[in-house]
């Protein structure tokens, strides 16, 4: 199944963080925080403005991004956990 976000929404796949502390302790899944970094896998066609025009999104597929830990809505597509959020919820592009 394909997922295509509407308007100013983007679909993001979380990027797994390191599961070992600087001291070498392995952090179990139950104690680890969800990553706030991810990769854009799909983008909508743009933000609908008040005047009826559509502004293209700044994000593109493949961008590595940072977002808030409570941003977006989690969805499962073909067994893969993804986040759907508005472009405004993305804080930065990691270059």
UniProtKB/Swiss-Prot annotation:
One family name in Pfam for this protein: Cpn10
GO cellular component: cytoplasm
Subcellular location(s) per record: Cytoplasm
Any GO BP annotation: chaperone cofactor-dependent protein refolding
Alphabetized UniProt keyword annotations: Chaperone, Cytoplasm
SMART domains, per the entry: Cpn10
Major subcellular location class: cytoplasm
Transmembrane portions of the chain: none
Source organism superkingdom: Bacteria
Family: Belongs to the GroES chaperonin family.
Protein name: Co-chaperonin GroES
């Amino acid at each position: 199944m394909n997922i295509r976000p509407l308007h100013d929404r983007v679909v993001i796949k979380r990027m797994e963080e390191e599961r070992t502390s600087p001291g070498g302790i392995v952090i179990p899944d139950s104690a680890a925080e969800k990553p706030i970094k991810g990769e854009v896998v799909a983008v909508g066609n743009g933000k609908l403005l008040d005047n009826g025009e559509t502004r293209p999104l700044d994000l593109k597929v493949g961008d590595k991004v940072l977002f808030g830990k409570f941003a977006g809505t989690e969805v499962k597509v073909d067994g893969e956990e993804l986040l759907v959020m508005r472009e405004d919820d993305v804080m930065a592009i990691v270059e």
